[in-house]
């Protein structure tokens, strides 16, 4: 492991050296007293008073955290997210001042992740750069060689509840194609809005051979991520929490918890570029109207039994399966009335029906709605057309990657 002084020098090279370069100008929504506190923290940092800077940052973070958690997320002013990001940045770097130990660097990395998750981009995505340096430093100090006592990936107490696997041979299955041309895919599936499984499109991605629980822990274990807790997001007891990937794997995959945990719909690949290098954007996305930067790539990682209730999304979707299998049902948007969407604005894109155990007295028309189904296996990519209703259940420990595009 490189020494703390080397780490400090690397971080110093990334950071602005004057208050002007920090660009602390913020909008009118941020109170003057908060801006003064932020400027004070910057002056303390640049003046070498790291302990005092750390204390000031904690006050800033506590106050801006309250602002971030007041009202709906989409109404949170971006400048408050910038305040939070600046606080996280200064805190992270202060924690790494020599002689910073591994625990301090881990705390600094958590501060960066909190800034990435809750803050807004500042100084050319500097939090991403600092996080990458800190992660590399931590990994260089603990990269254990697999020993004879280690079990194969995912076997140590991985949940094994023998979940039922639907017999899709009795259902109308999603058609399959092997590497169709762009023109054929566009004419027969994209334009008419027909689901299809694409085979041979993702087999060459590095993730197909590299990814295992051990690899994910090695590359991402120390990173803080949002985790959904509960059977499905429509349940009353459903909640979200933040924890490291290592904690998530230990609590919800290695052990047998009473609740299901799911790292769902998270832009993990923006947060951890090392994982992004293991996947590719499907060529078919070029048929869309947007730029490549506008494609939203999400991770879906969890134990067997995770469920995404029947819902629809406002964009085209390629769902690539990397680890494990998923049972998926698809309904055309024309069947919406028979799927009984929730009345509330928040859940209007989600059906009230429990797909595999429907209450047909309450939702009689659901039984008549035609659907397609499939079991999606590693290396396969499912095209889910825009607004197509889809229900997803993991049959195994599973990692999927979704690409939303317009």
Curated annotation (Swiss-Prot):
A Pfam entry, by short name: ARM_KDM8_N
Annotated binding of Fe cation, by residue: 311, 313, 390
Species for this entry: Bos taurus (Bovine)
Protein encoded by which gene: KDM8
GO molecular function, one term: aminopeptidase activity
Basic and acidic residues bias spans: 158-167
Protein name: Bifunctional peptidase and arginyl-hydroxylase JMJD5
Database matches in Gene3D superfamilies: Cupin
PROSITE patterns: JMJC (PS51184)
């Amino acid at each position: 492991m490189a020494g703390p002084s080397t780490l400090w020098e690397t971080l110093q090279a990334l950071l602005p050296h004057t208050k002007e370069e920090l660009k602390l100008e913020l909008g009118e929504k941020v109170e003057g007293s908060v801006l003064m506190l932020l400027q004070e923290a910057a002056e303390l940092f640049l003046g070498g008073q790291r302990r005092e800077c750390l204390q000031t940052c904690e006050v800033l973070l506590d106050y801006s955290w309250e602002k971030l958690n007041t009202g709906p997320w989409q109404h949170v002013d971006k400048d408050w997210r910038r305040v939070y990001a600046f606080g996280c940045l200064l805190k992270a770097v202060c924690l790494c001042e020599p002689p910073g130990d591994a625990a301090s660097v881990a705390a600094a990395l958590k501060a960066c992740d909190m800034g990435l998750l809750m803050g807004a981009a500042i100084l050319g995505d500097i939090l991403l750069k600092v996080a990458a340096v800190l992660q590399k430093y931590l990994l260089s100090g603990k990269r254990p060689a697999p020993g004879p006592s280690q079990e194969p990936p995912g076997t140590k107490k991985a949940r094994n509840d023998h979940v039922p696997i639907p017999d899709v041979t009795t259902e109308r299955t999603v058609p399959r194609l092997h590497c169709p041309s762009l023109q054929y895919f566009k004419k027969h599936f994209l334009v008419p809005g027909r689901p299809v499984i694409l085979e041979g499109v993702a087999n060459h991605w590095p993730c197909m051979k590299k990814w295992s629980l051990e690899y994910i822990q090695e590359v991402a274990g120390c990173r803080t991520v949002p985790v959904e807790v509960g059977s499905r997001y429509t349940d009353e007891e459903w909640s979200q929490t933040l924890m490291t990937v290592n904690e998530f794997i230990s609590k919800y995959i290695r052990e047998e918890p009473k609740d299901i945990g799911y790292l769902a719909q998270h832009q993990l690949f923006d947060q951890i570029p090392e994982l992004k290098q293991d996947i590719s954007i499907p060529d078919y996305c070029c048929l869309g109207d947007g730029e490549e930067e506008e494609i939203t790539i999400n991770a879906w990682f969890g134990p067997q039994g995770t469920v995404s209730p029947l819902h629809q999304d406002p964009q085209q979707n390629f769902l690539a399966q990397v680890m494990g299998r998923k049972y998926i049902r698809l309904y055309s948007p024309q069947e919406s009335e028979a799927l009984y969407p929730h009345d509330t604005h928040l859940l209007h894109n989600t059906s009230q029906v429990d797909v595999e155990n429907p209450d047909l007295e309450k939702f009689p028309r659901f039984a008549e709605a035609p659907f397609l189904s499939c079991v999606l296996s590693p290396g396969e990519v499912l095209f889910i057309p825009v607004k197509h209703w889809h229900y997803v259940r993991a049959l195994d420990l599973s990692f999927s990657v979704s690409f939303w595009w317009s």
